[in-house]
Amino acid sequence: MTAQNPSDQPSPTARELRLANHRLGAQNEKLTEALKASREKLAEINSRLADMAEPPSTYGTLLQLNGTGKTAEVFTSNRHMRLAVSPLLDRTDLQPGATVRLGENLQVVEVTGFADSGDVAAVVEVVGDRLIVADKLGEEAIVKAARPLQSLITNRELTTGDSVVVDRRSGWAFHMIPRAEVSSLVLEEVPDVSYENIGGLSNQIEQIRDAVELPFLHPEIYRHYGLRPPKGVLLYGPPGNGKTLIAKAVANSLSKSMGSSDKASRFADSYFLNVKGPELLNKFVGETERQIRQIFERARKIAHAGKPVIVFFDEMEAIFRTRGTGVSSDMESTVVPQLLSELDGVEGLDNVIVIGASNREELIDPAILRPGRLDVKIRVDRPDQEAALDILSKHIDASLPLAADLVAEHGGKEEAAAALCRAIAEELFRRDAAHRYVTLHLADGQTKDLYWADFVSGAMLANIVDRAKTFAIKRALSQAASTRDAAAEGGLNTADVLDAITAEINDSENLPDTTNPTEWARISGHATGRVVDITLAD
């Protein structure tokens, strides 16, 4: 067998050549893509190696850009340095107070914005483009305001008492931050409570209107007679009788009166700063005093805008106790003088008045209650039967769903509502053995019987009405379920209000504090002498 000569093999056809060429082209493209991917991977690795080899950057605070823009004053590593600025940087980005990144040769190479973290300090005073700030310990420092604060200063949105982020080392303040502490303690609003919403306190309302509203509405007459408006009003008396409601109604009435008065047309509204007294207490020394200063600073700021401001301290005895009576601390020895200085400072303002409310007026420091500070003292006592009817009429009226038989019996919804009010008042104000609550045993051997009528309050009456409404709703739901009629007739009836009175009395009958009967009697408004014991009715 002879070997075949290669030249004797048949030549490839044109089709075979085209297929071979296509295969070679595809292989070439794959090799090209692989080479490109390898180059990109190599470039990425080289970039990472370069980043790892790059020396660490230093950051600093730009103090100022010098005249030519080629150098800048920078505070870095606790040193004030003059450094070169990269020519690649836009000079408009180099704002004083901004944080800058420094290159290997301490050249400014990047602007990273303004610091959003640091120490928190309170603004004591705004001096041009600088601020006097104080920390929690009261240490003051003067810092420059960065660009984010400049517009706030220009628009007078940054004032004394506001909190800012500062860097004490570089001497800059960067941002204003909201302080929840004082905002949560103070409710700044125009209340929606009017005198018409308050029942049984017509005498007290007249007194406080004379003390508060007249000086605001007729300042020229007061000046003509040389009479200074009172700086403050104390509302005191047993709990639950409308002290806070009166204070809110004053602010609401002032807002309406000022808006409609031609002589006071510049007043658009009034402000009611409702200070939650016990929450002012703080374990850190000086914090309570600082918050009081901020509250009055806010009042002054609003008053300077020409708006009447009422600063209302609820539970006043909690923070302004008589000095020297503290058991575990002497906090009142500094808090009381702080309030006294603020009250005396209000003298130069025409639009600020302080209203305090307390159940324990005997615990408040006498210096606060003297004339010239809280001038007017109004006792808000428990309602009698007539006042109770007035209060009840605010809660039960013809707009409520009333039982059809009750309406038919009295000839109309208004008459039926009045009948329910009378039923509650007559039941509560009975003075017989069945309605006796407690017997007070006095130190001199005498005894004094107290009835439920002696403990009626506006809050108690409102609660009785709410209970009665609950009973009526539950009965209506039960009737609707049994009759499968969602519109089943219901409505408030006499049985509901009488059951509500019984439930209220049953819930309250074990509440008297027999461990300290004298204090309980005083808080309840029945301090007739030293009480040595309390006996509950059978």
From Swiss-Prot:
Residues 14-54 form a coiled coil. ATP binds at G240, N241, G242, K243, T244, L245. InterPro entries: AAA+_ATPase, AAA_ATPase_domain, ATPase_AAA_core, ATPase_AAA_CS, NA-bd_OB-fold, P-loop_NTPase, Prot_ATP_ID_OB_2nd, Prot_ATP_ID_OB_N. One of its GO terms (cellular component) is proteasome complex. One of its GO terms (biological process) is proteasomal protein catabolic process. GO terms for molecular function: ATP binding; ATP hydrolysis activity. SMART domains: AAA. Keywords: ATP-binding, Coiled coil, Nucleotide-binding. Belongs to the AAA ATPase family. Homohexamer. Assembles into a hexameric ring structure. NCBIfam families: pup_AAA. This is AAA ATPase forming ring-shaped complexes. It comes from Corynebacterium urealyticum (strain ATCC 43042 / DSM 7109).
